[in-house]
Amino acid sequence: SFKAVSGNPRYIKKAYGAYIEDEDNNKYIDYISSFGPLILGHANLEIKNAAKDALEKGTTYGACHKGEIKIAKLISKLMPSMEMVRLTNSGTEATMSAIRLARGFTNKDKIVKFEGCYHGHADHLLVSAGSGLSTFGEPSSPGVPKDFTKHTLVAEYNNIKNVEEIFNKHKNKIAAIIMEPVPANMGLIYPKEGFLKKIRKICDENNCLLIFDEVITGFRLCLGGAESFYGIKPDLSCIGKIIGGGFPVGAFGGRKDVMEKMSPSGDIYQAGT
């Protein structure tokens, strides 16, 4: 994004607490925190010790282990709408998988996202995505065929009338609404009073799943995420590196009857080592 804001990229040498140092020995207060997941700061001692302990036991197994059960139970406890949890390698994988699951569960193809909201770099989500795409000054990235995005419908955030118009135009064809409950990739936009409640109602009336992308809001808007803060229960939720203290990991989860459609218990494919 330096092309958009001018200047040269800073090459970081080390980071600790709230500070980062670059290769020229300049010291900065880090207000970015790796774009969100470092709520405990850089090089947190507890995270470092946990990582060292884990490395002593191996790097990757390609099999189940107790750690994933422990973290899944904790996620479900803090975000009760996530009755079942599936771990992924990133927030992008989480949103991709949640959308595939929503389409398979509802037997519908189209999804609704909001203009300026970023849900990862999956091809079908790079439509009016804000964030880094603003660098290009284009609504979508080159290299994404139009056929990949033809089922992605874009609505205006905080405009419930616009959402209703989209559902009226594409009746019985929309599998899910995916949204950042509080968009953070086009500035920081809070939902108008009643907006999320009306979105929930539209989904219920149209047999459509509501997906909260809590990659940014999860455990930071409040410990229980946006679903707890606003009292709105989504059908599926997605979270990212926040659950790994900054390490590359993510998760999605939600209603038990929906999640059970995912393989191996169901016929909707998802995998990852």
Question: Model-flagged regions — what are they?
Answer:
Residues 1-273:
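Conserved N-terminal phosphate-binding loop of PLP-dependent enzymes in the Aspartate aminotransferase
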